[in-house]
């Protein structure tokens, strides 16, 4: 059975209008497909704090035509110390940008989503659309919604995050908690940051924290602590956080003094990790956190979702002119197989608890900073499909992304 000639466009149904869903929709619309994005929330306002855009994610954003100039804050270094002030490592982000072709940016999530939605056709997004069921037959997929309506298409992409309904209905294994959680958010402190391009991470015996400039006077803060399913939220979360982290550094104390319980209202965010799923079924697949939720240890979640977009768009672009249902299924399985090894590598690294142990990380102080920088650069190279990315950029007539200030 033929699905539809590509010159007439595949009808793609995307469940979830976060960064993963909108980035994929941008790529598929660019390639001439007929895309509709369904979101259960009444609007697309992004919550949370900021995200780190590494070179691999920046390259995909460039391919999608997303203008990131002036968004957030580019970083020149990440300094890692212990809670007693001992220097462990400094990552040279400027050197990494030279080696990888794009700067590292800390960008508020709301700003990233705004940039993704620039020039995005509003009629392609349907809010207040809560999907409750999916099904697939030979040559067609269907999504059912809680208002009794349904919609049909040629393929379905689950981009609906950690608690993905689409993932549940594909029988993929559920996410498991790692035993840690983050209390996090953004704060505006004009008098705090001496160098707005330097991020700070501090590792202690029983927790860690980060203070990362996110553009203007905004600062992304997070405090990581152990977590379990029987966690009882304290009456004053900020009191607990201050008790754990006060005295770690002058900037930390300044942030702790500025925060209130209201700033912690949405926290904590427990860390989960999905087992990377096996092959999907038929014309249904997953991207982003719906596919591979991982702890924020390496700040790769958003970037890996963007790489999902790149590889999935490539898979569909390589379909024959009049693809059969089997052709489409093979393209989706190719996408899943191509991503699986690299996503699994990132997931394994993020699951390590080394970053939460001052004792384990003390030997890092004896390793030259240039080797820390080199190691992170090589890691990003290894998980980024750089050859494919370069070919796609050339095909789109894009020059290499070069580091920019700001």
Regions found by a protein language model. Give the residues of each.
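C-terminal helical "tail/cap" subdomain of flavin- and related membrane-associated enzymes
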Residues: 2-10, 298-299, 314-406
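Conserved N-terminal helical subregion
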Residues: 2-12, 29, 54-170, 174-186, ...
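Conserved mid-domain beta->alpha element of the FAD-binding
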Residues: 15-42, 157-158, 183, 261-356
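N-terminal polybasic phosphate/anion-binding patch
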Residues: 44-46
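Short beta-strand micro-motifs enriched in acidic
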Residues: 136-137, 212-216
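Short beta-strand motif preference
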Residues: 143, 210-211, 220-221, 286-287
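Flavin-dependent oxidoreductases
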Residues: 180-212
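FAD/FMN-dependent oxidoreductases across multiple families
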Residues: 205, 214-217, 225-304
């Amino acid at each position: 059975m033929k699905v539809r000639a590509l010159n007439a466009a595949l009808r793609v149904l995307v469940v979830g209008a976060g960064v993963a869903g909108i980035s994929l929709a941008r790529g598929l619309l660019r390639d001439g497909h007929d895309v509709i994005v369904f979101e259960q929330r009444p609007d697309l306002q992004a919550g949370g704090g900021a995200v780190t855009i590494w070179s691999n994610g920046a390259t995909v954003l460039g391919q999608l035509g997303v203008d990131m100039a002036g968004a957030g804050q580019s970083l020149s270094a990440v300094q890692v110390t212990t809670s007693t002030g001992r220097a462990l490592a400094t990552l040279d982000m400027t050197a990494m940008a030279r080696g990888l072709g794009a700067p590292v940016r800390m960008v508020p999530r709301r700003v990233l989503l705004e940039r993704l939605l620039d020039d995005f056709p509003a009629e392609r997004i349907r809010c207040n659309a809560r999907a409750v069921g999916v099904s697939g037959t030979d040559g067609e997929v269907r999504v059912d919604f809680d208002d009794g309506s349904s919609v049909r298409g040629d393929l379905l992409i689950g981009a609906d995050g950690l608690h993905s309904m689409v993932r549940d209905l594909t029988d993929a294994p559920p996410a498991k908690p790692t035993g840690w959680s983050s209390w996090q958010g953004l704060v505006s402190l004009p008098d705090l940051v001496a160098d707005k391009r330097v991020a700070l991470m501090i590792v202690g015996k029983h927790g860690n924290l980060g203070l990362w400039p996110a553009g203007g006077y905004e600062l992304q803060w997070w405090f990581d602590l152990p977590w379990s399913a029987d966690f009882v939220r304290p009456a004053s979360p900020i009191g607990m956080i201050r008790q754990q982290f006060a005295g770690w550094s002058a900037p930390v104390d300044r942030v702790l003094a500025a925060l209130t319980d209201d700033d912690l209202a949405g926290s904590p965010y427990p860390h989960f990790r999905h087992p990377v799923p096996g092959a999907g079924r038929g014309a249904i697949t997953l991207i982003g956190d719906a596919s591979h939720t991982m702890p924020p240890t390496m700040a790769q979640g958003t970037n890996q979702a963007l790489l999902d977009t790149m590889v999935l768009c490539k898979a569909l672009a390589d379909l024959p002119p009049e693809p059969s249902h089997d052709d489409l299924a093979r393209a989706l399985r190719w996408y899943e197989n191509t991503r699986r090894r690299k996503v699994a590598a990132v997931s394994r690294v993020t699951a390590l608890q080394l970053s939460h142990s001052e004792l384990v990380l003390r030997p890092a102080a004896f390793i030259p900073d240039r080797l820390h920088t080199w190691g992170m650069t090589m890691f990003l190279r290894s998980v980024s499909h750089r050859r494919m990315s370069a070919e796609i950029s050339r095909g789109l007539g894009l020059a290499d992304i070069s580091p920019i200030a700001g």
